Amino acid sequence: MKKLLAVLTASALALSLAACSGAASSGSSAAASGSASQSEAASNSASAEGASYRIAIVQQMDHSSLDEIRAAIEAELDARAAADGITIEYQEFNGQNDATMLNQIGTQVVSDGYDAIIPIASLAAQCMVTAADGDIPVVYAAISDPATAGLTDLPNVTGTSDALNTAFIMDMMFAIDPDIQTVGLLYSNSEPNSETPIADAKAYLEEKGIAYVEATGNTTDEVLTAVSTLTDRVDAVFTPTDNVIMGAAGAVAETLTDAGISFYAGADSFVTSGAFATCGVNYTDLGSYTADMAVDALLSGEVPADYHVMDGGIITVNTETAAALDLSYNAFTNMVDNVVEVTTAAE
């Protein structure tokens, strides 16, 4: 199979997130593994054998969760091309979390005649949907709340959601420490992925009569300043699948752990960066499912109206952080079937 892989933004631009998973009302939920609709696409793949497709993979920024998703997308595109007897050429683009660059990438991808676009994360998806304007299938990956991000009820647009069950993560927090008095909510107010989870966290805490303190930042420097304001004011911190905060996750986790504060987050990439715990989806499964959706759309000529909510159910704990905080996490084994232990990844 022929494959085109460019680990640059693009030559023209090189210079210039049931148990843990949420449920979105406008999406559809199914198992985390397997093809989006391979059984329906089987007859289409037979008739499409020998066809060639070009797919643009547009990653919002570099961090471990998005990197894992991209790698899984590429692996599944390779696998589907071999299985279906087709050629899939794909090219990577990276917007460096910059809307201007992402818009430029969108313009280039459309003008270059790609057959489909797979944007990873909210800002990338929004920019690609605008650029495609309904003319090219856009199959997004890892959007926590597609409705809030303005990615529903649009022609030729679908994808996967890693929607959080914020209440469950709050339950985890209080299962470990029932005496928590104040919770810090650390997020970027420019990140669509954070809007619904933060609102849900506030509602949960208000119902329990627990105080909360908000801290926000839209750049790495702002995030580090924001977290420093929490260290003497809160007992635990929650961050959703926020790509901006993830960009500084290692420094945030270190600051909070040094202050004796447990850090709960919306993705396992935070935990491998030093946060204490999360509960969410498997991002390799999410990437594979997204790739299947894109290939099935190309083979069938039809883009599903509903997005797909990935199943969660996996608690991930950083054992080094647990030891540093002197926390036992035995309570988690009563909450889910699968508790994964990790350590902090080397930078």
Each predicted region: which residue ranges?
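Bacterial lipoprotein signal-peptidase II cleavage site
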Residues: 19-39
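Extracytoplasmic "Venus flytrap"
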Residues: 48-75, 80, 91-100, 190, ...
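Hydrophobic alpha-helical segments within soluble ligand-binding/sensing domains
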Residues: 49, 146-152, 158-182, 281-302
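An alpha-beta-alpha
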Residues: 55, 73, 162-205, 306-323
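Periplasmic-binding protein-like
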Residues: 56-58, 109-122, 139, 183-185, ...
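Structural motif
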Residues: 87-111, 216-230
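Flexible loop/hinge segments that line or gate small-molecule binding clefts
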Residues: 127, 131-166, 265-277
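Hinge/cleft segment of the Venus flytrap/periplasmic-binding protein
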Residues: 296-347
